[in-house]
C-alpha cells in the first residue's frame, strides 16, 4: 500500500480533529510511561482514557501501546483525536544532558490512524543536544509532510523546578517549537 492509499487524509482534516472550530484544544496526556516510567495514576492508561471520553476534551496524547490497547474504546468515540508520541527521552546522570530517540515513525502513525505525531523538545540540555533535537524534529516534519501528518513539538524543561526563570525560558522554547 503506497503513500497515497495510507495518507488519504489531508493535514487540514487531521488538524481539524485535534482543534475545535475556535482553534482550542484540550488534550489529555497519558503518554508519560515512555519517559517517566510507572506513574501511579497512569498505570492503567485505557481506564484513565475511559474517564475522559464523556468529558469536554478533544483527544489524548498516547504511545503506540496505548493506541493499540484503546482501539475499541476510541472506535466508539470517533470524535476523539489521538496524538502519538513518537520519541522518548531519558535524563542521564550528567547535568544538562539526556538521551532521546525515535520509538515510532510517521508511517507507523499513519498505519495506526492517529491524527498527529508529537516529539519532545527538551530545552534544559546542552547546546549540542538542542541542535540534535531540532534536527530530528526537522527530519520528522519533512517525512510528515509526505504523509499529510501534523507534527507537534512539546517544549519541556525536564526535572526543572517551576521557577520564574524556567517560566520565562519556556516562552523561548515555545517559540522555537512553533517555528
Where are these regions (language model features)?
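Alpha/beta enzyme core
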Residues: 20, 25-29, 33-77, 81-91, ...
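N-terminal basic/disordered segments at the start of proteins
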Residues: 2-21
Amino acid at each position: 500500500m503506497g503513500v497515497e492509499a495510507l495518507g488519504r487524509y489531508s493535514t487540514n482534516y487531521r488538524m481539524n480533529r485535534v482543534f475545535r472550530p475556535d482553534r482550542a484544544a484540550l488534550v489529555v496526556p497519558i503518554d508519560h510511561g515512555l519517559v517517566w516510567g510507572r506513574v501511579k495514576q497512569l498505570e492503567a492508561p485505557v481506564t484513565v482514557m475511559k474517564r475522559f471520553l464523556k468529558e469536554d476534551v478533544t483527544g489524548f496524547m498516547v504511545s503506540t501501546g496505548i493506541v493499540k490497547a484503546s482501539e475499541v474504546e476510541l472506535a466508539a468515540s470517533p470524535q476523539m483525536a489521538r496524538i502519538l508520541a513518537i520519541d522518548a527521552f531519558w535524563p542521564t546522570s550528567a547535568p544538562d544532558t539526556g538521551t532521546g530517540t525515535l520509538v515510532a515513525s510517521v508511517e507507523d502513525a499513519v498505519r495506526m490512524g492517529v491524527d498527529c505525531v508529537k516529539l519532545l523538545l527538551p530545552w534544559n540540555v546542552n547546546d549540542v543536544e538542542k541542535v540534535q533535537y531540532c534536527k530530528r524534529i526537522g527530519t520528522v516534519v519533512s517525512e510528515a509532510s509526505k504523509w499529510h501528518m501534523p507534527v507537534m513539538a512539546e517544549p519541556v524543561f525536564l526535572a526543572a523546578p517551576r521557577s520564574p526563570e524556567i517560566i520565562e525560558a519556556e516562552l523561548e522554547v515555545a517559540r522555537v517549537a512553533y517555528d
